[in-house]
Amino acid sequence: MTESTAKVQVIGGGLAGTEAAWQVAQAGIPVILHEMRPIRTSPAHHSQELAELVCSNSFGAMSSNRAAGLLHEELRRLNSIIIQTADKHAVPAGGALAVDRGVFSHQLTQTLQNHPLIELRRSEVQEIPSDGIVILATGPLTSPVLAEKLQQFTGMAYMSFFDAASPIIVGDSINRDIAFLASRYDKGEAAYLNCPLNPEQYLQFRDELCTAEQAELKEFERETAKFFEGCLPIEELAQRGEDTMRYGPLKPVGLFDARLGDFRDPENKEKRPYAVVQLRQEDKQGKLWNMVGFQTNLKWGEQKRVFRLIPGLENAEFVRMGVMHRNTFINSPQLLDPTLQFKSRPTLLAAGQLIGTEGYTAASAGGWLAGTNAARIALGLEPISLPSTTMMGALFEFISSASPKHFQPMPPNFGILPDLPVRIRNKRERYGKYRDRALADLNDCQTQLNNHQKNSVILV
């Protein structure tokens, strides 16, 4: 098979690329899957198998009442090869879908190699193919040569090589009796939620930050992190001095709770906060809030413990923890449509961690949609996007519509789904309703698509 006879090329043999190539081939379209290993290795991989799980062997919670579990179920219903293989090789892991990673990756490699329409090509791709239908699924450790070409294609401002992200919190879990909505000096629209701290609260918070247990950067991440002096972990700022945070991300000047009066009134001077943690709106609906300046290397359990000491966040529900690690990803809101096509070149698609989704299952979901749409383009059909009420649809709607200025990778979570018609306070019941709506709407979507393409096997 050559590039001219193959209708689609997939670059990258991780979870996203494996899923994408399978969906293209299952639609009857010849595909070349490029994987650079073992010709060129990465610091994180240990084998030449496709879909190697380089970190945990877990795909997250199995229950469809959980965000990851709902995404599993959606992919299961869409005939995902990744989830089918994970189900087949699952190992006991409590409530999580975990796999025997060696057997899992080996079977996927054999399955794709044996497909008559898939050619697995072991070579490093150093250029983005200039024509034809192409899916980029090169992952967080994209080779330096291809990363440079991708950076040239997208523009310098639209590539990130180190993921320094603050935690993201569900808005409903923030105590609005304490947190107040305001912008500094009342300039412009009140765009931030602000959590005020008095001196005692601030010093306790700083002490806990300084002694909290940190996660170690991997060896290959340390060099990249050296260039990030301008984006230091919050615990590093805390250790540099008692007031360092108060003159940095926790700066209180110009922030005052209007419920307490006019901050310009000298009589209210004693009411002004000693320090302020600011939360910035993360999505259009205002359901998710980002802790401004709180990129961190703390272990996840420590983040929850320490950050819940902040007044107003005592019951905070985290949908994403703060991270600092090597992660090549593009600015998807600037570059991609919800179909995962590049706006500037609709025959070029992308999937996986490269587009700013987080986690194994989300990478597989991106591979499914990119592969499905690449096949549809090859067949002369319109690309699809899934309903925003599904976890898949909501995730790709988010990464293609979030603020480009503040875009950071996002895992699947219920906070990105549209509100239910009726507010439900019980979390378990609310998540169950999200699940029921998502699966019903996914079923309707499949039915409608199949009615319009009787001869296609993309969706069954």
UniProtKB/Swiss-Prot annotation:
One cellular-component annotation, GO: cytosol
A matching Pfam family: GIDA
Top enzyme category: transferase
Compartment(s): Cytoplasm
GO biological process: tRNA methylation; tRNA wobble uridine modification
Residues binding FAD, per UniProt: 12-17
Gene3D superfamilies: FAD/NAD(P)-binding domain (3.50.50.60)
UniProt record similarity statement: Belongs to the MnmG family. TrmFO subfamily.
Domain of life the protein comes from: Bacteria
Alphabetically ordered keywords of this record: Cytoplasm, FAD, Flavoprotein, Methyltransferase, NAD, NADP, Transferase, tRNA processing
Protein name per Swiss-Prot or TrEMBL: Methylenetetrahydrofolate--tRNA-(uracil-5-)-methyltransferase TrmFO
Cofactor(s) needed: FAD
Transmembrane segments: none
Molecular function (Gene Ontology), one example: tRNA (uracil(54)-C5)-methyltransferase activity, 5,10-methylenetetrahydrofolate-dependent
Function: Catalyzes the folate-dependent formation of 5-methyl-uridine at position 54 (M-5-U54) in all tRNAs.
Protein EC: 2.1.1.74
InterPro entries assigned: FAD/NAD-bd_sf (IPR036188), MnmG-rel (IPR002218), MnmG-rel_CS (IPR020595), MnmG_N (IPR040131), TrmFO (IPR004417)
Reactions performed catalytically: uridine(54) in tRNA + (6R)-5,10-methylene-5,6,7,8-tetrahydrofolate + NADH + H(+) = 5-methyluridine(54) in tRNA + (6S)-5,6,7,8-tetrahydrofolate + NAD(+); uridine(54) in tRNA + (6R)-5,10-methylene-5,6,7,8-tetrahydrofolate + NADPH + H(+) = 5-methyluridine(54) in tRNA + (6S)-5,6,7,8-tetrahydrofolate + NADP(+)
